[in-house]
């Protein structure tokens, strides 16, 4: 039996760190779908295409995104940390509201998640990409906590950032992600919500692992 784990939640809720650790501890594949939206958003912005442009579908037909090992490739070129900036996150949110972008990436994500045990994280994993997931988790935390986490993460990478600006961006992304017409950020009816505001990463991971071991019958 394949063990499929969906981890959804807003920006800065800890999805990426938690999902990576769970995949590592279980020895199964990991997919960061948010990275794909960052890749596409940054690319489309770089070539001057607006988020609501009617030409996006034609452009995406010539775009090739691959996930090999633990790395992403855009048109044959390995993608680096440029997709981890706050600006790339904003582009991801803006272009994700375009139905053509979501259709393009959802198709790729569904293919990656099929016929394997995997931990996939994003904003619509449990509702759209992997509705048949064995375990669905929805992580939440206050905007202030999420902004602080993102601030510390980016500072550790020697990026010049402002906490106030990150908080503003997170609140804007929450609004965009929750209110978009296509695949908005919503908790799946059968997802288990975990508030990570006052929990360490290790505590969140252990909580989820307990659920996974029971649902996936892992000893």
Curated annotation (Swiss-Prot):
Its EC number is 2.7.4.25. It is found in: Cytoplasm. It catalyses: CMP + ATP = CDP + ADP; dCMP + ATP = dCDP + ADP. Its main location: cytoplasm. Keywords: ATP-binding, Cytoplasm, Kinase, Nucleotide-binding, Transferase. The keyword Isomerase does not apply. The keyword Kinase applies. GO terms for molecular function: ATP binding; CMP kinase activity; dCMP kinase activity. It is an enzyme of class 2 (transferase). GO terms for cellular component: cytosol. One of its GO terms (biological process) is pyrimidine nucleotide metabolic process. ATP binds at residues 9-17. NCBIfam families: cmk. HAMAP family: Cytidyl_kinase_type1. Belongs to the cytidylate kinase family. Type 1 subfamily. This is Cytidylate kinase. It comes from Fervidobacterium nodosum (strain ATCC 35602 / DSM 5306 / Rt17-B1). The lineage of its organism: Bacteria, Thermotogati, Thermotogota, Thermotogae, Thermotogales.
